[in-house]
């Protein structure tokens, strides 16, 4: 029973080692050069719902201000972006990076013609999401920021008008170094690894059978508890290796493996 509670406590501790991002003090401002504009307003992120719709026209600027929080403290993430995607065609999307300074204070400014022509011509609204993440995280922090309605004034529409020749004209060369695609594990090695994990678990069952005659697993003595704890540590290590092979990233595996190593060390010292 004690071993069960220790394992449960370790899992909670290891989960805390995996950093989680959040944002605080977030505001969305829509400002206009026209002081009499009715569209200018200021909203807190907490006031914005997924169904909230706000309009962006030719002379208005969308400003986002927020603070990136990592485990309760302001910090600079590796990525902080505003994602705009067509509501009816989600694959049609664009990402705008936010500028993040010391303490996690971030800001982003977006004008109408910063948005690609393909999105300006869309008849549907644009879904806005704020994404914050760091390397090693499989799922970024995502915050919905409502729907953005694009209203291109007739006097400016020619700037956003689409022409078939645009698809044929020379495009600007974008210089970017992409990381190589991840290497796929060798099929034979995958089978060997899976077999070794299963065989090790069978071996652990044999060790457990040898330990049973020597001690009462329900005894409160330190010797029997250490054997139970040691066996549980090895079993958790085997299960952890299998989960790592199937779903965990190397960063998550490192956090969990450190806790398992501590458990094994405590058990070995107690024997």
From Swiss-Prot:
Residue ranges of the TM segments: 188-208, 231-251
Signal peptide: 1-18
Disulphides: none
Top-level taxon of origin: Eukaryota
Classification via Pfam families: Ribophorin_II_C (PF25147)
Assigned GO CC terms: endoplasmic reticulum; oligosaccharyltransferase complex
Ranges of the Lumenal topological domain: 19-187, 252-271
Membrane topology: Multi-pass membrane protein
Chief site of localization: endoplasmic reticulum
Keywords: Endoplasmic reticulum, Membrane, Signal, Transferase, Transmembrane, Transmembrane helix
Name this polypeptide is given: Uncharacterized protein C553.06
Native source organism of the sequence: Schizosaccharomyces pombe (strain 972 / ATCC 24843)
């Amino acid at each position: 029973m004690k071993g069960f509670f220790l394992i449960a406590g370790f899992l909670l501790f290891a989960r805390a080692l995996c950093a989680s991002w959040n944002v605080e003090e977030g505001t969305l401002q829509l400002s206009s050069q026209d002081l009499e504009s009715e569209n200018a307003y200021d909203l807190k992120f907490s006031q914005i719902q997924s169904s909230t719709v706000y309009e962006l026209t030719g002379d208005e600027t969308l400003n986002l201000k927020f603070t990136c929080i990592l485990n309760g403290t302001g910090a600079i993430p590796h990525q902080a972006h505003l994602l705009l995607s067509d509501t009816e065609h989600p694959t049609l999307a664009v990402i705008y990076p936010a500028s993040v300074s010391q303490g996690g204070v971030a800001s982003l400014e977006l004008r109408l013609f910063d948005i690609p022509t393909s999105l300006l011509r869309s008849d549907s609204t644009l879904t806005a999401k704020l994404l914050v993440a760091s390397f090693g995280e499989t799922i970024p922090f995502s915050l919905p920021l409502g729907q953005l309605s694009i209203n291109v004034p007739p006097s400016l529409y020619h700037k956003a008008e689409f022409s078939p020749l645009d698809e044929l004209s020379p495009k600007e060369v974008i210089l970017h170094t992409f990381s190589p695609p991840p290497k796929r594990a060798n099929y034979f090695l995958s089978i060997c690894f899976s077999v070794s994990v299963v065989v090790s678990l069978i071996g652990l069952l044999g060790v457990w059978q040898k330990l049973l005659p020597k001690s009462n697993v329900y005894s409160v003595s330190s010797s029997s508890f250490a054997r139970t704890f040691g066996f549980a540590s090895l079993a958790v290590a085997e299960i952890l290796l299998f989960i790592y092979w199937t779903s965990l990233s190397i960063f998550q595996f490192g956090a969990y493996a450190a806790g398992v190593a501590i458990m094994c060390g405590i058990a070995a010292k107690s024997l």
